[in-house]
Every structure is written in C-alpha cells, then in structure tokens.
C-alpha cells in the first residue's frame, strides 16, 4: 500500500513507482488521504483501508506528514486499539509484521530516518508523539530527481526545516560533545545548499 497526499496522487507522481511495484509481481493499492500534521482521523481511515486490503508492505511517498501517517498505520496493523492510546503508551508496541518503505519527496523533515512519528488530534487541538524501535522505516529511498517537482521556495522551506532541527539540537539543554559538532556541520551544509534554490528562483524573476 502506498501512502501519499491527494495532490501527489492527482499530479501522477506515483505512476513510475506503481509501475515498478507491478513489475515486481505485486499489486499495489493507494491510500491518498494523507493530510498535513497526520490527523488521527486520517490515520484511522488508513488503518481500516490497509486491513481491508490485507497489505504486507507500506510505502510512504511524500513529505513528513505522509511519513508520519504511514508510520502510524504500519505500527497499528498488528495491535488492537486506537492510535491515541498507542501514543499514550496504553498499548505496548510490538515488532511489525509488515515492511515499511519511505520515499521522501521533500528535503527537510528527515522523517524517513527516524523511529518517531507525530499525529494530530484536531478535536483536542493536541499533537501526540509515538516513538519506539518499530516505528522507523525498514528502507529509505532518497531520489534527488523527485525534488525537481518542487518549487525553489518549497525546497528552501523544507531545507529550513532541516536547519531548524540542527539549531534545536545545538541549543537544547541535552546537547553534548558528540551532538554539538554534528549539529554545527548540519547547519553549515543546510545553509550552503539553501542558497542554490534561492539563486535559481531569483534567476526566474
């Protein structure tokens, strides 16, 4: 099952991915209801959809919200209960029986490399975090060609996301001698590459 947003689906960005899955002898299904901040209603719908289609693998295709939605769905397929109870620690995480692949289409969230997810309870206006060794993707595929579909301003915005994470890591109270040089290096790399989309956008004006 591929998890993505409606815009990604409507633009046909999944076509080559779906063709690749079919060429491997698999029949893909698509849950294209991913929304910003991964609302719990969307996650619940995705869980139901995945169970109805008896999926054995999930592919997250999109930005951080699609990643978080896919992570939450993957974690909940083998347990009974609700995603909010899972986030609150009322449901014990267990090793997933399904495979989780992550293909990011932005360059800033880093969600494809972490075992942490965030979902939004819009009714309570509260974001829940879930984090455990089974929440992270089994495989992450980074294809720079996918970034060509983004506008320079969107690339810059998502790169600023990466810069912000690095700045937080450097300035937080838990920073240590191992973390600080890595955070500084990450900020330097982010700053260097932020200039490229900015210059490209200026040249188009």
Residue ranges and their predicted role:
Residues 4-5, 33, 103-105:
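Cofactor-binding loop segments of dinucleotide-utilizing enzymes, especially the Rossmann-like FAD-
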Residues 1-2, 57-59, 101:
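Conserved beta-strand elements of the Class I
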Residues 203-205:
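Hydrophobic alpha-helical segments, chiefly the membrane-spanning helices
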Residues 9-81, 198:
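N-terminal small/polar loop signature for handling phosphorylated ligands or for N-terminal nucleophile
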Residues 192-199:
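Conserved small/polar residues in nucleotide/adenosyl-binding loops
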Residues 10, 14, 39-43, 51, ...:
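Generic structural signal for well-ordered, non-membrane alpha-helical segments
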Residues 78-177, 181:
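A glycine/threonine-rich phosphate-anchoring loop and its flanking beta-alpha core
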């Amino acid at each position: 099952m591929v998890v993505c947003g409606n815009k990604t689906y409507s633009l046909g960005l999944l076509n080559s991915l779906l063709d690749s899955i079919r060429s491997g002898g698999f029949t893909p299904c698509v849950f294209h209801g991913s929304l910003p901040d991964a609302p719990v209603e969307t996650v619940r719908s995705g869980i139901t959809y995945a169970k109805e289609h008896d999926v054995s693998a999930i592919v997250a295709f999109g930005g951080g919200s699609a990643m978080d939605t896919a992570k939450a769905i993957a974690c909940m397929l083998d347990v009974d209960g609700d995603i909010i109870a899972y986030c609150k620690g009322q449901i014990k995480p267990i090793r997933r029986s399904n495979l989780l692949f992550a293909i990011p289409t932005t360059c800033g969230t880093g969600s494809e490399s972490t075992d942490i997810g965030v979902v939004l309870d819009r009714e309570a206006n509260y974001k829940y975090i879930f984090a455990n060794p089974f929440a992270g993707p089994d495989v992450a595929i980074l294809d720079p060609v996918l970034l060509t579909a983004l506008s320079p301003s969107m690339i810059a915005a998502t790169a600023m996301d990466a810069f912000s994470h690095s700045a937080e890591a450097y300035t937080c109270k838990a920073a240590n001698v191992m973390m600080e040089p890595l955070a500084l290096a990450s900020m330097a790399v982010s700053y260097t590459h932020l200039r490229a989309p900015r210059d490209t956008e200026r040249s188009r004006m």
